[in-house]
Amino acid sequence: MPRPGRNTYSDQKPPYSYISLTAMAIQSSPEKMLPLSEIYKFIMDRFPYYRENTQRWQNSLRHNLSFNDCFIKIPRRPDQPGKGSFWALHPSCGDMFENGSFLRRRKRFKVLKSDHLAPSKPADAAQYLQQQAKLRLSALAASGTHLPQMPAAAYNLGGVAQPSGFKHPFAIENIIAREYKMPGGLAFSAMQPVPAAYPLPNQLTTMGSSLGTGWPHVYGSAGMIDSATPISMTSGDYSAYGVPLKPLCHAAGQTLPAIPVPIKPTPAAVPALPALPAPIPTLLSNSPPSLSPTSSQTATSQSSPATPSETLTSPASALHSVAVH
């Protein structure tokens, strides 16, 4: 059966697949690449059947563009008007259709994984895209469209990207090689060492002289620490953190520590309380003997004055002091 002519496809569905229709539209372009809107326009202008139910077949066509390796996506340059990327045929799918007929497709074009890993394949694809870009530029120049000047590096699709000289501040190289600095601007190694919790041997004399001025009753006028024999310690007596490993003593036979602990001073004797007046015993002496149980004790206290010790120890005197106060 002979193939029907193009003009007989008026309202009938054409015998072309979506892949054939897309390839036909791309091959008809001088630049060999078209945006998606131009592909739609070509199909609807050529085949009236696709002027209806556009949403259904356009979704199917987009699905074929995305999931078939025979189509490649080319990003649009920033200086080009419009939106959306361009679609082109893969350079290796030239023999996909038998004898150049879009009605017969030999087999499904598939890019092997080894082709993705081969170094020559990306270079061939980049060279093809560069040629297509040059063809498009020449076509635009022939039509008189003015394009802004772009650097040559923008069209160098096959070149190898140069490594950037910028290094992230948190990269592992910068973290390892960075010299940590304090907020004041000084390096950490230039800071003064932190004093240890225990005094070093060369600080004992200074501490002793300062303590001697504050505790004269312990150290005397000249200071006990100044008259003591100087302490000689080796480097093994102290650890790396300044903590003494041996007890600090003046000599082998002495038990007095190098920094004496202040001794609590002996409290002075409490002065005796003065003799209390006896107005209450006078009142009690005037009362009857039956009502004053302490009349005998009152007479004794009036005849002989009480000593300070008796005043503190006698219960009767304690009662008198409470009554007076």
Curated annotation (Swiss-Prot):
Pfam families: Forkhead (PF00250). Disulfide bonds: none annotated. It comes from Mus musculus (Mouse). Residues 284-325 are annotated as: Disordered. The keyword DNA-binding applies. Residues 12-103 bind DNA. InterPro entries: Fork_head_dom (IPR001766), FOX_domain-containing (IPR050211), FOXB1_B2_FH (IPR047389), TF_fork_head_CS_1 (IPR018122), TF_fork_head_CS_2 (IPR030456), WH-like_DNA-bd_sf (IPR036388), WH_DNA-bd_sf (IPR036390). SUPFAM superfamilies: Winged helix' DNA-binding domain. Expressed widespread in the early developing ventricular zone of the neural tube and later restricted to areas of the spinal cord, hindbrain, thalamus and hypothalamus. Expressed in epithelial cells of developing and adult mammary glands. The gene is Foxb1. Residues 284-309 have a biased composition (Low complexity). GO terms for cellular component: nucleus. Keywords: DNA-binding, Nucleus, Transcription, Transcription regulation. GO terms for biological process: axon target recognition; cell migration in diencephalon; epithelial cell differentiation involved in mammary gland alveolus development; floor plate development; hypothalamus cell migration; inferior colliculus development; lactation; mammary gland lobule development. This is Forkhead box protein B1. Its main location: nucleus. PANTHER family: FORKHEAD BOX PROTEIN, FORKHEAD BOX PROTEIN B1. It is found in: Nucleus.
